[in-house]
Design a protein with these regions (language model features):
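Short glycine-aspartate micro-motif
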Residues: 2, 67-71, 77
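Active-site glycine-centered loops adjacent to acidic/histidine catalytic or metal-binding residues
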Residues: 47, 73
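ATP-binding/phosphotransfer module of carbohydrate and carboxylate kinases, centering on a glycine-rich
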Residues: 1, 9-15, 31-42, 55-64, ...
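A charged helix-plus-loop insertion that forms the helical arch/lid used to bind
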Residues: 14-25
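A short acidic/small-residue loop/turn micro-motif
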Residues: 24-25, 94-96
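Conserved beta-strand elements of the Class I
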Residues: 68-70, 98, 165
Length: 217
């Protein structure tokens, strides 16, 4: 059993810490619990790490030695691939980019579903309204793209990848925020790095599942 969880993890011991969406999960020995229950091997990692691993092995990241997979949904996180191997850092927390300070809060408040709550809407509603040509919705996506472009620049500074693969539910609306994101990226100071990185929207729905299964290989 391979599992991705939205939190930091002791991957060797299979301990899950501080799951944001499950407040009672402060320090859960999930690997031990599941192995005792099902009598099979269990591997646990951060969910964004699983996404990045899946994309690196089977998806848009496959051509690249060094890439970052970014999941955009109820929150935002990243998995880092260096030399075609997952780099998790201590407690698999290397890609917790949503917690980077930004403006009056952090990037998660501006580059995930939290952003749309600020505009009294949802990503799905904003996408549907944008498809209908509603200017207010198009403006919301333009602003979202600007914030995401600023986060991409941070990723370039931190990891200098060859590719950044975007995944998660919000990426279905990629055409509405792509231009604003790319425009904002143009202020990155190292032109040679900017010219040699690809930002790609994932077309796979099962990258995280594939990455979680690969934890056992």
């Amino acid at each position: 059993i391979g599992i991705g969880v939205p939190s930091i993890v002791d991957s060797e011991k299979g301990i899950v810490y501080n799951v944001a969406n499950i407040s009672s999960w402060k320090e859960i020995r999930l690997k031990e619990i599941l192995e005792n229950e099902f009598n099979v091997a269990v591997a646990i990692n951060n969910d964004s790490n699983c996404f990045a691993l899946g994309e690196s092995l089977y998806g848009e990241g496959k051509p690249y030695d060094n890439m970052v997979g970014v999941t955009i949904g109820t929150g935002i996180g990243a998995g880092v691939i260096i030399g075609r191997r997952l780099y998790g850092g201590q407690f698999m927390g290397a890609g917790e980019i949503g917690s980077f300070p930004y403006l009056d809060a952090d990037f998660e408040r501006y580059c995930s579903s939290f952003f749309f709550k600020r505009h009294d809407t949802t990503g799905a509603a904003a996408a549907e309204n944008a498809r209908q040509g509603e200017q207010a919705a198009l403006d919301i996506w333009k602003e979202f793209g600007m914030h995401l472009g600023n986060l991409v620049k941070v990723i370039l500074f931190a990891y200098a990848p060859q590719a950044i693969v975007l995944g998660g539910g919000i990426v279905a609306a990629y055409p509405f925020f792509k231009d604003a994101m790319e425009y904002t990226m143009q202020s990155f100071p190292y032109r040679v790095m900017l010219d040699n990185v690809r930002v790609i929207a994932s077309h796979q729905n099962d990258s995280s599942l594939l990455g979680a299964s690969a934890l056992l290989e």
